[in-house]
């Protein structure tokens, strides 16, 4: 059975994001109190705050970990129109600091003229790259050419999405058959604007990102978006958090069917749509194999979704903050599968937790 542990976060305002590192033993939180906190898991399973610092001059919307191959590196983004990259260093300068760690700001990315709403490191096979999106509808992709010098970042790409951007997700596939791809969600509140999820793909010929697809069926504001880890699948799975939970499959069409030399075209299907939260859904997060999806909503629950052998998606668990499963609101199974799902979520490849908006 899933065990819930309450953590006294000591944030002074709303907590907007919770992010696990690659191994699931470190956690970062960010808040409207303009701070980021880093938590480490002890041997007995307790979480201890090991660092807390003021990061921005506005609400901090998102925080995310780089792959540990690049060291202990965080990125944050804020209403103050900036994103920042932070690195943990172990003090060696004098006896007092030796062995103690602290976080140092390596760079501030100041290209946005409006609130920076999401920040995500690219999959590690692409090198140390970072994507941001902002309320003015621009996605920016930066690269650190020297991974030993995180103070130098170059702006590689600017993508104009024409809609206010709220969230981004890299396609984690490392297959050479798949070009780098990024999904962008919009929280534009106008019901007349369709297609609030856009997919951009990198074109080797033009060396630019071009729009590959628009999910026209998504017309409500999008709060979160997440590609599933791709373990040998020939197609992609994308989860979208809006007023409900939606799961899409994207199957690449054969090259002769898509324009030669252009972007890949996809056959897109909505394979699941769940309104069980009966409220806005704020976060979606996959486990490490891309087989279990967690969602969290304003109903105060985390719901777990999994496909059966017929590829029908079902709810397999509903969790509340007190650790108790919620009775009959989910037809599925509880017990070991839920526990293992939560464990795999903590070891999620993209390090993102499924926690939605939380109060401190």
UniProtKB/Swiss-Prot annotation:
Belongs to the WD repeat SEC13 family. Transmembrane segments: none annotated. Signal peptide: none annotated. WD repeats lie at residues 10-49, 55-96, 111-152, 160-210, 217-258, 276-315. The keyword Acetylation does not apply. This is Nucleoporin SEH1. Gene3D superfamilies: YVTN repeat-like/Quinoprotein amine dehydrogenase (2.130.10.10). The gene is seh1l. InterPro entries: G-protein_beta_WD-40_rep (IPR020472), Sec13/Seh1_fam (IPR037363), WD40/YVTN_repeat-like_dom_sf (IPR015943), WD40_repeat_dom_sf (IPR036322), WD40_rpt (IPR001680). It comes from the Eukaryota. GO terms for cellular component: GATOR2 complex; kinetochore; lysosomal membrane; nuclear pore outer ring. GO terms for molecular function: structural molecule activity. Keywords: Cell cycle, Cell division, Centromere, Chromosome, Chromosome partition, Kinetochore, Lysosome, Membrane, Mitosis, mRNA transport, Nuclear pore complex, Nucleus, Protein transport, Repeat, Translocation, Transport, WD repeat. It holds the Pfam family WD40. It is found in: Chromosome, Centromere, Kinetochore; Nucleus, Nuclear pore complex; Lysosome membrane. It comes from Xenopus tropicalis. Component of the Nup107-160 subcomplex of the nuclear pore complex (NPC). The Nup107-160 subcomplex is required for the assembly of a functional NPC. The Nup107-160 subcomplex is also required for normal kinetochore microtubule attachment, mitotic progression and chromosome segregation. This subunit plays a role in recruitment of the Nup107-160 subcomplex to the kinetochore. Coiled coil: none annotated. The GATOR2 complex is negatively regulated by the upstream amino acid sensors CASTOR1 and SESN2, which sequester the GATOR2 complex in absence of amino acids. In the presence of abundant amino acids, GATOR2 is released from CASTOR1 and SESN2 and activated. SUPFAM superfamilies: WD40 repeat-like. Component of the Nup107-160 subcomplex of the nuclear pore complex (NPC). The Nup107-160 subcomplex includes NUP160, NUP133, NUP107, NUP98, NUP85, NUP43, NUP37, SEH1 and SEC13. Component of the GATOR2 subcomplex, composed of MIOS, SEC13, SEH1L, WDR24 and WDR59. The GATOR2 complex interacts with CASTOR1 and CASTOR2; the interaction is negatively regulated by arginine. The GATOR2 complex interacts with SESN1, SESN2 and SESN3; the interaction is negatively regulated by amino acids. PANTHER family: NUCLEAR PORE COMPLEX PROTEIN SEC13 / SEH1 FAMILY MEMBER, NUCLEOPORIN SEH1. GO terms for biological process: attachment of mitotic spindle microtubules to kinetochore; cell division; cellular response to nutrient levels; mitotic metaphase chromosome alignment; mRNA transport; nuclear pore organization; positive regulation of TORC1 signaling; protein transport. The lineage of its organism: Eukaryota, Metazoa, Chordata, Craniata, Vertebrata.
């Amino acid at each position: 059975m899933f065990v819930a542990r309450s953590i006294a976060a000591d944030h002074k305002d709303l907590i907007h994001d919770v992010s696990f590192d690659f191994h699931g033993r470190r956690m970062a939180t960010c808040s409207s109190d303009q701070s980021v906190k880093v938590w480490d898991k002890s041997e007995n399973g307790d979480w201890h705050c090991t660092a807390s610092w003021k990061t921005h001059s506005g609400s901090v919307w998102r925080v995310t970990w780089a792959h540990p191959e690049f060291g202990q590196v965080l990125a944050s983004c804020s209403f103050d129109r900036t994103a920042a990259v932070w690195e943990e260093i172990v003090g060696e300068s004098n006896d007092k600091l030796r062995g103690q760690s602290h976080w140092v700001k390596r760079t501030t990315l100041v290209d946005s003229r409006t609130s920076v709403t999401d920040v995500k490191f690219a999959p590690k096979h692409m090198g140390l790259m970072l994507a941001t999106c902002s309320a003015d509808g621009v996605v920016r992709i930066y690269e650190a050419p020297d991974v030993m010098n995180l103070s130098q970042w170059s702006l590689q790409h600017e993508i104009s999405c024409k809609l206010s951007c709220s969230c981004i997700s890299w396609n984690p596939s490392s297959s050479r058959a798949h070009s780098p791809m990024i999904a962008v969600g919009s929280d534009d509140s106008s019901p007349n604007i369709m297609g609030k999820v856009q997919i951009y793909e990198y074109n080797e010929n033009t060396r630019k990102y071009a729009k590959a697809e628009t999910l026209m069926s998504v017309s409500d504001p999008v709060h979160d978006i997440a590609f599933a880890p791709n373990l040998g699948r020939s197609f992609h799975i994308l989860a979208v958090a809006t007023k409900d939970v939606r799961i899409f499959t994207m199957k690449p069409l054969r090259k002769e069917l898509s324009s030669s030399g252009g972007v890949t075209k996809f056959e897109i299907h909505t394979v699941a749509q769940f309104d069980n939260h009966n409220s806005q859904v704020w976060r979606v997060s996959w486990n490490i194999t891309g087989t279990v999806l967690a969602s969290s909503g304003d109903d105060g629950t985390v719901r777990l979704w999994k496909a059966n052998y017929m590829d029908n998606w079902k709810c397999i668990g509903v969790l509340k903050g007190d650790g108790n499963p919620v009775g009959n609101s989910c037809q599925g199974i509880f017990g070991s599968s839920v526990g293992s799902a939560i464990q795999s979520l903590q070891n999620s490849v993209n390090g993102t937790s499924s926690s939605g908006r939380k109060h401190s």
